[in-house]
Amino acid sequence: MFFGLMAVSCDKEELLQEQNIKNDSSIAQKQSSMFSYIQSIKINNGVDCENNILVFPSWEKLWDTADKLDEMIDYECDMFDATVPNNITDDDYDALADAVGFDEDNVLRAFENDLAFCSLRRKIERLENDWLEIQGDGEWNTNEDPDNHFIFDETERTLFSANTEVIIGETEAEYVYYKLIDDFNWIEVHNWDLEAIRQISIGVIPINNSNVIVQNIVMDEVPETPVECKKHIKIAKYHVNGSNRIKQKSKVINNSWWGAKKISALTVGYKKKNGKWKRRRTTITAGITGVSGTNNCVLYQKCGIAFEKHKVKERKRRRVKAKIRGHKYKGESLIIGVKPQKAYSYHKQGSINLKLDYYDMQ
C-alpha cells in the first residue's frame, strides 16, 4: 500500500558514503523495501546488532513514516478482524490470533527485520515483559515501568535506536546525528564525527568539540496561578478492573525543533493469566473527545484559533491509540493547545470508563 514512496537521491547516498570515508569508516547501508527513503547502518554506539541506527532525509519524513506505519497496522488489524466471528469473546479472539500468528506488532517487526534494525521498541518490549513478570496485584510504580519511556508510542519507538538515536539529513550538504534525552533535551553531532558519537554512547559528552551541540530547551516553570492554555502534558496511570487492568497514557507535546507536535491517548490492556500479568488482547478503547465521549473536543492553534476534532478507536487489542498530529493549519505549523473542559482523554475497558480532562492532568 505504501511501497514505492519517495527515494533518497543518489546524491544523498554518495554524500553519506563520502562522509564515512572522511571518518575512516566503511559503513554498509541497507535500504528499506517498505520506504525507499530510509536506510539502516551500524555505528559505534554500544548497541551490538547488524544495524543499530536509521537514516531519514528529514524529521518530517520520520513523522510521516510513523503515520504511515500506523495506517498499515490498522489495515492489517482490520483485515484480520474481518475473518473473526461476530461476538467472539476476548479469550477466544486471543486464542485465534495466536493460532494464526496475528499480532498488532507484526507490521513493526517486519519493518525492523527488513532493515536488520534493533529498535527502541524492541528493547522496551523485552524490558517490559521482564518487569511484568514480577508485578503483583497491588499498585504498580509508574516510574519503574519500562513502557513509560518519554517516547510513549510504540510506532515512534520503532524508528529510533535502542539509545534513542537517529540520523537526519537536514540539508543536501550534511547528515546530523541526534540523541534524544527527553522530550525537550537532546545532543546533536554534525560533520559525521563518529568519534564524538562513540564518546556520547559511553556517556561522555565532548563539550569542547565544535561538532557537538547540546540542546537544553528550558520549559516554562509551573506558574503560581493557572494558565489559560497548556501545550505540554504527559501522564501514565493504571486502572484496575478485577483480573483486568489498563494503563492510560495521555500526552500533548509541541517540540518545534524536531517536529513532534501531537495530542494522543493510548490504552494498554493487561490480564492476569496463570498467576502472571501480561499485555493481553481485550476489548479496549482510546479516544480524544469532548466531555461526553461522542462529541468533538476543542483544540487550539497556538492557544488562539479554536478547531474541533474527534477520534475514537475500540478494538480487541493489547493497546489502542488515538492520535491527532499537528500538521499545517491555515498556512501555519500547528501548535496544539488545550483549555479547561475542552478536550478529554478517553479510555475504556469493561467497567472502567474514563474521560479525563487533558488540562487538569497532573
Residue spans for each PLM region:
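Mature secreted bioactive peptide module from preproproteins
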Residues: 211-362
